Amino acid sequence: MSSRHFKIKNSLFWWVAGLALASDRLTKAWIVATYALTVPPQTTPIIPGVFHITYVTNTGAAFSLFANGSIWLRWLSLIVSLGLITWAILGPRLDRWQQVGYGCLLGGALGNGIDRFLTGEVVDFLDFRWIQFPVFNVADIAINIGIVCLLWSAWHPR
């Protein structure tokens, strides 16, 4: 008797996307439950002057780019997400770096996209003060990791 195993194509893509999305949603839920959205923002120094948890919202894209662009950004994140899902299902089998890269992009796009559709703005809270960088979130990290993985894959083909 032969046993058939159902194997999902690009399974690492789905795992990475799920992990990125879950990490983003859980950390944002914790921030919203723990901190008040105030002006000036409520902040907790983790390493004073270097890294703080600072609850702010952002109507733009990653790192506050395109501020006040939440209407078109919500649709862009939906289109990107649907495109990545379609690519993973109907496209070719991706190499490991591509699966991680596209999975990170999907998880990040969904994480910030959910915020944009629910509230019109994205929750940000990771505040690295020693480099004077905009406050960001886990979805932003996932998107940037995804870009690095895809660049790596392009520069180091199988």
UniProtKB/Swiss-Prot annotation:
| Keyword Hydrolase included in the entry's annotation | yes
Question: Which of the seven top EC classes does this enzyme belong to?
Answer: hydrolase
Disulfides per UniProt: none
Known pathway: Protein modification; lipoprotein biosynthesis (signal peptide cleavage)
State any GO BP term from the record: proteolysis
Q: What is its main location?
A: membrane
The active site lies at D124, D140
TM regions (residue ranges): 12-32, 46-66, 71-91, 135-155
| Domain of life per record | Bacteria
Q: Where in the cell is it found?
A: Cell inner membrane
Q: What does this protein do?
A: This protein specifically catalyzes the removal of signal peptides from prolipoproteins.
Hey, which family's this protein in? Belongs to the peptidase A8 family.
According to UniProt, the name of this protein is Lipoprotein signal peptidase
Q: Which organism is it from?
A: Thermosynechococcus vestitus (strain NIES-2133 / IAM M-273 / BP-1)
* UniProt lineage: Bacteria, Bacillati, Cyanobacteriota, Cyanophyceae, Acaryochloridales
Encoded by which gene? Answer: lspA
